[in-house]
Amino acid sequence: MTSLTLPDIAAQSAQQPLPLDWVGMCGIAMPVQFEGRQLSALADAGVSLDDGASRGIHMSRLYLALEALERDTLTPRLIHQVLEQFLFSHEGLSASAHLRLQFDHLLKRPALVSPLAGWKHYPVAIDARLKAEMFHVELSVEIPYSSTCPCSAALARQLIQERFDQDFTGQAVDRQGVRAWLGSSSGIVATPHSQRSMAKLQVRLVGDELPVTVLIDKAEAALGTAVQTAVKRADEQAFALANGQNLMFCEDAARRLNLALRQLDWVAGFTVRVEHAESLHAHDAVAVSRFQR
């Protein structure tokens, strides 16, 4: 059998020598071990190409380095080791390495009152970068919640007051009559508008943990109106009460989250973006808040 040397085109010199900021692969399907479960993730893996004379990088080396994520529990330390392998396998070519992992985090959530429970999924992204021995990890998560407009609530209350004046003008008002009126469709003539909203949190981490569940719990507690899964009527009533007691503009939601996240000692900084998918308008109401220690 004739022995052939396979060509390595990537090792050739570039016809137009120029460094590149990032070269790699996106959307690599792979399993990761996280919080005692195996999850299906998508990985973006890459390095800088600082040697502009080189034609390209060795993508297969990056791909093989990702195998470590299949075996061990996902932590910042493990990610650091993977990025070190990226750079080790591209010594002389690359000075920085980047890894992004995306997956859905499933949590079983109890109903507000009844014994029911159901699953919610939270999109999660982990971004890590290694350059000049400086290692950074950012954790991003999207959290849905409900928001009821304070202005709309005030306008609805005013209309109810006006209808009360119309219906009871010149009449003796008794408790039972008012109670019956409040429970009728003629009494509550207006309701405030609510919408499903989204909080997008991007947090720079300190330490060797990826506290996704803790971050989600902290954010949902601050907002007070987490969307529900399986419910009975008692749960729906409790949800209506929670919305009424947590009227929020997008500005209010952003401030609540800012104050809650800055209490976490494993957070070095964060960006909060809240989006209220307005039911009154065809556009969204958005607020952004940042914090850095």
Curated annotation (Swiss-Prot):
Function (record text): Converts GTP to 7,8-dihydroneopterin triphosphate.
Organism: Pseudomonas entomophila (strain L48)
Family per record: Belongs to the GTP cyclohydrolase IV family.
Organismal lineage: Bacteria, Pseudomonadati, Pseudomonadota, Gammaproteobacteria, Pseudomonadales
Enzyme Commission number(s) of this protein: 3.5.4.16
Protein name: GTP cyclohydrolase FolE2
GO molecular function: GTP cyclohydrolase I activity
InterPro entries per UniProt: GTP_cyclohydrolase_FolE2 (IPR022838), GTP_cyclohydrolase_FolE2/MptA (IPR003801)
Listed GO biological process terms: tetrahydrofolate biosynthetic process
Record pathway: Cofactor biosynthesis; 7,8-dihydroneopterin triphosphate biosynthesis; 7,8-dihydroneopterin triphosphate from GTP: step 1/1
Primary gene name: folE2
Name of the top EC class for this enzyme: hydrolase
Catalytic activity: GTP + H2O = 7,8-dihydroneopterin 3'-triphosphate + formate + H(+)
Keywords noted in UniProt: Hydrolase
Site description May be catalytically important, residues in chain: 149
